[in-house]
Amino acid sequence: MFIFASMNLYTIGHSNHSLERFLQLLQSYHVDCVVDVRSVPASNYNPQFYQEALDSFLQGKGITYVFMGHEFGARRLDSLDDTGQVDFEKAVDTDSFQQGIIRMQKILNDYQHVTLMCSEANPLTCHRFALVARYYNAHGFDVNHILSDGTSVTHKSLEREMVEQYLKAKKRVLPEIDELFGSYTATQQLNDAYRLKNKEIGFRTEHEEYYD
């Protein structure tokens, strides 16, 4: 495993914040580099987060902006399943994602407080949680998700919330699930929850208007 200057990583969603509010959130966590993981670095409803405008604004505040939507974006054609939906587990093994890991090695060594940025306010509804942050959490990083109210939540806490959400859904359909799945390990539960999350939020090729 690579050893970095910092093993901390943040994520954030720009949502409909003003640039000033977005800056406040970043500064609260001493962020010095924003890695944009949107496939399309634009927003129809929040033009302040177009790539050029955001890059210029952050540079003026002493924060580095890096676009990595090609490597870490959700809208990818290199890892589709048979239904035309992106498979996050396949995505991690693609050349583009692996190139992103290589690029991130330098970023994580050059900066102390790096955040991945996408559009959704809630990390649980975004691929930054289910794809990119999942990878770094599994590789020993302390991943924290910055929320719109200025608080943050650990990746592991969100994983527990996700597992509980899907287990509750299963129990509503099949109340005897505890007896039937007595050997259903925590690792299996987590992996299955990630797959269900993938099905819920993963990009489909017919959704051409999708921005992430």
Language model regions located:
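Residues lining hydrophobic/aromatic ligand-binding pockets adjacent to catalytic sites
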Residues: 2-212
